[in-house]
Amino acid sequence: MIKNSPFIAFIIYCLPILCIAQPKYEYWDADKKQVKSEDNYKRGIAHGKTASYFKDGKIARLGWYKYGKQDSTWKFFYENGNPKAIEHYDFGVKKGHNLYYYNSGKAAQETVFKNDRPDSIWTSYFESGMPRSIESFNYGKRQGVWKYYYENGKPQSDGLFENDKKNGQLVNYYPNGNVQSQENYCNNAPCGKWAEFYDNGKVKIEKEYKDSIEYLINLWNEENKQVIVNGNGNLTLVSDKGKLRGKGTYQNGLRNGVWMFYYEDGALEYTTTYINGKINGPYNAYFQDGTLKSSGKYIESKKDSLWGFYRSNGGIEMQGTFKNNLREGQWTYYFESGKKESEGYFADDKQNGTWKYWYKTGELWKQGVFANDIKNGLWTTFWENGKKLQEGNYVNNKEEGGWQAWWQNNQLKDKGSFKDGIMIGPWQGFYSNSKPNYSGEYKNGKKNGKWQYWFEKTGKPREITNYVVGFKHGEFIQYTENGFVDNKGKYRKGKQTSTWQYYYETGGMQRQQHFKNGHLSGKSILWQLNQKMQCQMNYTVIKDNRKGHEQSVPNGTWIFYDKNGSETNRVSYKRGVRVQ
């Protein structure tokens, strides 16, 4: 909060007049004992010193703004007083050497920025002081040798970047210093020969990348038994917990034949067939209890032909055809009950042609036409009894032209027009007994002009409202069902204005009030059912600075009367406060 100060208050209130003033704001804690932060402004924009403080008064942040942008040196601190970071800015742009520290005060990282982009050598450290990483940048892009270390000082990995892409050899190490893997990259893509090793230094895998395809050449298990020789052999995949996760055959460095994969508990997860490293042929996946989960066929590692997907209870969930991994042709989706949920056609994985949707009970819900995933053409929605609910055309996923809606008894409910998804022109509504409900016009999706509403049973007027582009504006009147006026008045841009009158159901006056911009203002009168005066009131409108809006409050003399209309009491107010 801002501490109460005559000097500060003077600056704040004079700011609109003294445009060249440069006020200083101090924000204090709840007890007003300690400054939490301070900021300087020029012409309403942060300019000059800025600072924040811990509860004990020690500084947490110290910096400078220049016309709303960070500038010069910024310093950040831990609660113990040790530095946390030192950063440099030039009119909002980070630059130069920047330093970061651990809570202990030891260096954590040194960075360099050039025009707000990483540049030159970045170095980070463990809290012990040992190097953690050495990274090289050139104007925001990784460039040159990158090295990472374990806290014991031994290397973790090192590699080369060229123009932000991995190029050349990347080596990873175990904490004991032995090589974990040797990788080669060409423009960020794996290429050439790769090797993996066990932590005892013995070779685990030798493989090679050709045209982005991985070829497994040799593989040794933990007992140092070679199971893949020159790209051929049977391989068993085991989890870190020693559980069987998969098994199959390699030929000429690529997976071939039937492969089987398992859940951690040993249950079969899925089976598939490989030809020269690509999935070709039948594919079947299972839930852990052995229930079929999905079934289909692959060609060149892409889903193809008819596929079925099933629920854990054995019921079908969806079924359709793939072509080159994309949905093609007719697809059908099902509820858990097994009844159809929706059905239609895909072309290149996009909905096309007529689609139908059903209620869970089995009755048709809606149907319409898609063109490349976009609604186009006639769409019809139905009640569960089969009668039409609504109908109209879409163009590019938006309602267009005349639309109609019906009640379940087939009586017209609504009718009107759309343009580009927006309601336009005359609209009419009807009750299920075919009597009129409403009538009016839309302009660019907003009510405009005179709108009329009627009661359902009697057909008598219920309300007459005038609109200007969505706002109630002009004469307004509401009626009771027996034909008497209930209330009437005027609106201006959606807010009550001028004199409003309210009536008893018998037709007698109940109250008369005056409004200004939606708020009670001026004289209001209340009448009793016998039409004797009950109360005379006066209001004025004030601005509530705390809430940032206007409100009506009692003002002037209020006069009260008994059931016979004789005065019983008077009370005076001044801007919401009762005056003795």
Q: Where do the protein language model's features map onto the residues?
A:
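Glycine/tyrosine- and acidic-biased, solvent-exposed loop/turn segments at the edges of beta-strands
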Residues: 19-580
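Bacterial Sec-dependent N-terminal signal peptides
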Residues: 1-24
